[in-house]
């Protein structure tokens, strides 16, 4: 009898953990227009000027835990936005596009966040570009060529089309399957671990959601 109740409890706990449910309008919302042309499973919009975006990368390390707890092969497409249409943000957007094309994201992401928000060593477009060149060991000629290339322009054009289509109005914004946006601010931040676990649970729930 004792063994029966232990088995029942294990089954019950297993059933509970695999059937977590979240509420539309609370933990997540539908995007304004659903993307229909086979969007990546996860799209993240961020800004190097956004303190909360910095927290997601540095403090919570969300992408690391997505790959660790969901799948190491899960594709995450990341875009740096220019919501203010300012020249400095435009250059940040371009630098990020170059980084993605050249697979240099990990070399520049945290250092540029820190240079802008923590150390305040990146305050102008020239020292932004110089910092990027130092971090990536790229020369200025190559950077100018790549940053003005068709590939980079196409990357930014596609990004801005998505932003307009879904009516992006804030960062950070995590879009799941081109249908849902996570409401980050509703997730309680009692502890780093609590926030990470809840965030990952919501992503997993939306990735598995049928409709």
UniProtKB/Swiss-Prot annotation:
- Cleavable signal peptide: 1-19
Q: Which domain of life is it from?
A: Bacteria
Question: What CDD domains does UniProt report for this protein, alphabetically?
Answer: DsbA_DsbA (cd03019)
The entry's keywords: Disulfide bond, Redox-active center, Signal
Q: Report the SS bond pairs.
A: 50-53
The record's listing under PANTHER family reads: THIOL:DISULFIDE INTERCHANGE PROTEIN DSBA
Sequence similarity: Belongs to the thioredoxin family. DsbA subfamily.
Query: Briefly, what is this protein's role?
Result: Involved in disulfide-bond formation. Acts by transferring its disulfide bond to other proteins.
Can you say what this protein is called?
A: Thiol:disulfide interchange protein DsbA
Organism this protein belongs to: Buchnera aphidicola subsp. Baizongia pistaciae (strain Bp)
């Amino acid at each position: 009898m004792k063994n029966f109740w232990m088995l029942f409890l294990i089954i019950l706990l297993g059933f509970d953990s695999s059937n977590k449910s979240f509420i539309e309008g609370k933990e997540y919302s539908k995007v304004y227009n659903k993307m229909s042309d086979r969007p990546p499973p996860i799209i993240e919009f961020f800004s190097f000027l956004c303190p909360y975006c910095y927290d997601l990368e540095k403090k919570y390390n969300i992408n690391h835990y997505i790959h660790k707890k969901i799948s190491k092969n899960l594709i995450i497409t990341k875009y740096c936005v220019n919501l203010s249409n300012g020249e400095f943000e435009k250059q940040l957007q371009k630098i990020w596009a170059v980084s993605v094309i050249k697979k240099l994201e990990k070399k520049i992401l945290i250092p540029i966040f820190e240079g802008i928000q923590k150390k305040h060593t990146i305050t102008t477009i020239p020292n932004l570009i110089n910092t990027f060149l130092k971090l990536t060991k790229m020369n200025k000629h190559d950077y100018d060529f790549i940053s003005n290339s068709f590939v980079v322009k196409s990357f930014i054009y596609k990004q801005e089309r998505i932003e307009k289509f879904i009516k992006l109005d804030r960062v950070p914004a995590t879009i799941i399957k081109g249908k849902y946006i996570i409401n980050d601010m509703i997730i309680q931040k009692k502890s780093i671990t609590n926030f990470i676990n809840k965030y990952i649970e919501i992503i997993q729930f939306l990735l598995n959601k049928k409709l």
